[in-house]
Structure formats: C-alpha cells, structure tokens
Amino acid sequence: MQLNSTEISELIKQRIAQFNVVSEAHNEGTIVSVSDGVIRIHGLADCMQGEMISLPGNRYAIALNLERDSVGAVVMGPYADLAEGMKVKCTGRILEVPVGRGLLGRVVNTLGAPIDGKGPLDHDGFSAVEAIAPGVIERQSVDQPVQTGYKAVDSMIPIGRGQRELIIGDRQTGKTALAIDAIINQRDSGIKCIYVAIGQKASTISNVVRKLEEHGALANTIVVVATASESAALQYLAPYAGCAMGEYFRDRGEDALIIYDDLSKQAVAYRQISLLLRRPPGREAFPGDVFYLHSRLLERAARVNAEYVEAFTKGEVKGKNGSLTALPIIETQAGDVSAFVPTNVISITDGQIFLETNLFNAGIRPAVNPGISVSRVGGAAQTKIMKKLSGGIRTALAQYRELAAFSQFASDLDDATRKQLDHGQKVTELLKQKQYAPMSVAQQSLVLFAAERGYLADVELSKIGSFEAALLAYVDRDHAPLMQEINQTGGYNDEIEGKLKGILDSFKATQSW
C-alpha cells in the first residue's frame, strides 16, 4: 500500500480548517477549606463583594469576605460533599430571584424555587435580592391605612401603607397570629402579601400555609421559606429575597405587605456566618454591621410617588403611588426590649406593637400593651371614623391601668373612680378578639362607638363578648347598607353618628344578648 503525501497533506489541512477553537476566559480558584457552610477559596483575584461563585454540582456560594490572598464565601445549599482542592469559578453576577404575579399563591425557598409541588413558576423575570432603597425625593408621605382587622391595633396603633411597624414580644405571645390575621384581612383590599418564614419548623410553616388556604388568602400571598434545617446563608438571605418580590408590586404602583417572621433568627444566622468568616465579634457576639443588616432591609419598605412609578415603568403606569408595608417580628427574651437586636429594630421602624406574656396568660388576646406600643406615622393614615372614635380608647385604658394599680391598696373608692375602673375593664374585655376573625372598619367603628358613648355601662362584664356578637349579627341583618357605606368611605359626620346612635338604641331595647 502506497501513501500519497499530497492526499495526506490535504486531509490534514481540511481537519485544521474544521477545527473550532472556542476560548473561554474565566476567573478560577481552588477551595482551601470547608467548615459549616463557609468555604475559603484561593485564586479568585477579581472576585467582587456579593458575587455568586459557581461550585461543582450546579450550586452557588456568595462571596462575603475579600481578603489579601483568599475569598470567604457562604454556600447556598448542602455543602457536605465539598472538599479541599475542588475548582470553583466566578460568575460575574449577583444573586437574583424570580419575581412577578405568577408567584402569588405559591410557596418558594430563598432562591425562588417552588417547594409546594405545584409545578414550575410562571414569573416575569428576575430581580436582585440586594437593592438600593428609594431616596427621600422619590417617597410619598403615608396617608392610606392597612387594616389588620384587630380592634386593638386599628384603633390605638394604626398602620399606614408604606410604614414599618415592628411586632415585638416573647415567644408564645401571638406575634405570628397577629401577622397571619393581617394577611387574611387583605383578601379583598387589593394589597398583595409576602410572608417570609425564617428559621421555623417545617411543620409550623405547613400549618400557616394551610390556614391561609382555608381562609382564602393564599391566592393573594407569596410564602418564602427558609426552615430551621436549612443553612445559615439561606436563612440570612430569605428576607432580602422576599423584599425583592414585594418591590415588584411597589415599583409598579401597587400596594404590598411583607411580614418577616422573624428577624431575630435572621440576626442569629448572620452572627453564625460572621463568626465562621472570622469577623470580629461585638456586643452579644454580633458583628459590627448587624444594624446595617436590618436597616438596609427595612428602608426598602416605603410609599413611592407617582413620578417614581412612571419612571420605573417607562410611562406604562401613570398617576399611581406604590407602597411596600413591612411588619418585622422580633422575639425578646423575658420581655427584654433593651437587648441589642430589639433596640436596633425599634430605632429603625416607625413604631412597635408590644405583646406581653402576662396579658396573654390573663386571656387578653391580642396581648397588646397600649402603654409602650406606638405608631409614629400611622395616625395620618387612619380613616376619619376610626380616628374620631378611637381617641378615647387609649385614654380610658391608660387611666384604667393607673387606677387599677392604686385600687389594690385602697379599700374605699369614690363613685367616679369606680366608674372609670368599670369602664376600663369593659373596654379591655371589648378589645379581646379571636384568631382568624378579623373585623371590618364598620364593625370596629360600631363597637368602638358603643364603648365611647357609654352603651356598655349597664352591660355585665361577663356579657361583653355576647353583647358584641349579638350587636354585629343585628347590624348585618338589619343595617347592611350603612355598614357598606362606612366600609367604602370611612367617613364620619352628624348623619352617620345619628344612625349609629339609632342602631345602638334600638339594639339595647331588644335585650337580645
């Protein structure tokens, strides 16, 4: 067999011409240590703060520490099979999560992946988990209410759209119950809800999702979950992911409500990450930037003006204000509100609802302490009728608490003091409310009107609950148009006052409670 040199050279030329060289430049490094979800990488010279790092097995880590000759990163997801010597590379991207209306009614994890078994998400794109909060000029003052459906909250500690109102209290005082009822009450208000569960048991979250579904509120809600069994990195990032999903609605001229349950567990997860990254510990072993951890999150809850919305949507949405209202939850230890994280969040937010163990155990639920609970901006957002009728409630309770303390030592009390004590007891009883039973503005207004105008004076303390139930059943049956008018307008004038007085007079005559 004879070899033809010409043919061979032609064949080689063809093969060389067909050879496709695609060069890809990437910044590659090597894992030098793995410990509790934190990896140290050598060789990523151009890595940026907060950049996603691609790991073997289609996983990612986020770069948090940029040091002279190494990078400290937290792994998002399982890390047991990661080992020294493995190759990793920079992606040039920061963490993004899916956003859009298709997420409503779904349960997702921190990275936006569905975990409810209902198939893939129908999303409108991706949004960065870290975003700069709107500036002062882009904001609008808070002047529209968010009704929680709780008499004690909507009357004394009103919440406005775009406000940050802290729910604070010891464990088992009804913090989550208050937040879940606030979500249930938004079924027909048009406010979209995001519930972020951080460091909770999967069984607890499953129960919350079931309750939302039972009460028809899940279709209006996105549930973001980072359970206690998940890595500290996912628990730390969950609130930012939920906030990005809420900002989608805010920036398009809609209203959204986000609940962080709870930020104490997020701070603990961040402390764990920081200590593993060898950052210097400060008070209570928290890192120095734990204030910034919460402030950069909560400042993103805001009411933005129409110009901001128009600029963001490139003119598609005009004349609409958007808002993101935040209800962060903080768990205290033995009622200590002066601990590090509680004081930080109190100073960041626009008020707090303080839930007390003693009140809860005494059967006063919601266990709101009106003495140290406050809403700094919500008063401007209250409806006219609620503002008018709720003024005397806080005063009556404050006087009652003061007199109750003195009456323990005094044996003979004058009639005026006895009346005040009796009125205070009845108002306290009236503000009690069952879980999953939010009340409309009209129902609350009627009940507050009865307390304000002395209609409870001759009702026995033990009958206050049945008096309220019978009164609400009576108006729903015979005076539904007036209730609808109050719910729609929230107005208060002499005519409405006269009608409310007439309803209560005719109801008292029936003695049906």
Curated annotation (Swiss-Prot):
Keyword Manganese among UniProt keywords: no
Pfam families reported in the protein's UniProt record: ATP-synt_ab, ATP-synt_ab_C, ATP-synt_ab_N
Subunit structure as annotated in this protein's UniProt entry: F-type ATPases have 2 components, CF(1) - the catalytic core - and CF(0) - the membrane proton channel. CF(1) has five subunits: alpha(3), beta(3), gamma(1), delta(1), epsilon(1). CF(0) has three main subunits: a(1), b(2) and c(9-12). The alpha and beta chains form an alternating ring which encloses part of the gamma chain. CF(1) is attached to CF(0) by a central stalk formed by the gamma and epsilon chains, while a peripheral stalk is formed by the delta and b chains.
Function: Produces ATP from ADP in the presence of a proton gradient across the membrane. The alpha chain is a regulatory subunit.
Compartment(s): Cell inner membrane
HAMAP family xrefs: ATP_synth_alpha_bact (MF_01346)
Organism field: Shigella boydii serotype 18 (strain CDC 3083-94 / BS512)
UniProt keywords, alphabetically: ATP synthesis, ATP-binding, Cell inner membrane, Cell membrane, CF(1), Hydrogen ion transport, Ion transport, Membrane, Nucleotide-binding, Translocase, Transport
Gene Ontology annotations for the cellular component aspect, listed alphabetically: plasma membrane; proton-transporting ATP synthase complex
Protein name per Swiss-Prot or TrEMBL: ATP synthase subunit alpha
Keyword flag Repressor: no
EC number: 7.1.2.2
Chemical reaction(s) catalysed: ATP + H2O + 4 H(+)(in) = ADP + phosphate + 5 H(+)(out)
Site (Required for activity): residue numbering on this chain: 373
Recorded topology in the membrane: Peripheral membrane protein
Cystine pairings recorded for this chain: none
Family: Belongs to the ATPase alpha/beta chains family.
Regions that span the bilayer: none
Major location (coarse): membrane
Binding sites annotated in the UniProt record for ATP: 169-176
